[in-house]
């Protein structure tokens, strides 16, 4: 009986993981971004994105392939990075190829009401960025 319960739990875990992966596959565009630093909070709305010509798109592809393209780096120019992605618990981890180096960028993620919420905190814990994306 314990063996059957264990196998059933393993199957449910694998099924849930596949569902999470399938839900993320596609192109997501950032339409709202909030930066929190201490007691200060700055929000960039969809209208502000449009007015500034700003955009950031995330491409979660099959076989763990990933691409991001946009102009939010602060320089205004459009840049593209490619790599891979994976889900670990409530985090999505993008491994980006930056020249000769690889860099892991991890976000806590939540899918809610057809929106993807990506949250990242700076290593020192002082700045938190929350991006809200919708599927294209």
Roles of regions detected by a PLM:
Residues 17-82, 86-136:
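Lipid interaction determinants
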């Amino acid at each position: 009986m314990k063996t059957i319960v264990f196998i059933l739990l393993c199957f449910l875990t694998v099924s849930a993981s596949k569902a999470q992966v399938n839900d993320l596959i596609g192109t997501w565009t950032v339409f709202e971004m909030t930066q929190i630093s201490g007691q200060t909070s700055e929000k960039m709305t969809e209208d502000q994105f449009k007015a500034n010509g700003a955009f950031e798109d995330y491409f979660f592809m099959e076989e763990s392939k990933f691409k991001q393209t946009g102009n939010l780096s602060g320089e205004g120019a459009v840049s593209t990075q490619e790599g891979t992605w994976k889900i670990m618990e409530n985090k999505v981890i993008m491994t980006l190829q930056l020249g000769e180096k690889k860099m892991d960028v991890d976000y806590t993620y939540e899918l809610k009401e057809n929106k993807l919420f990506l949250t990242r905190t700076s290593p020192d814990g002082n700045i938190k960025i929350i991006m809200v994306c919708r599927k294209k």
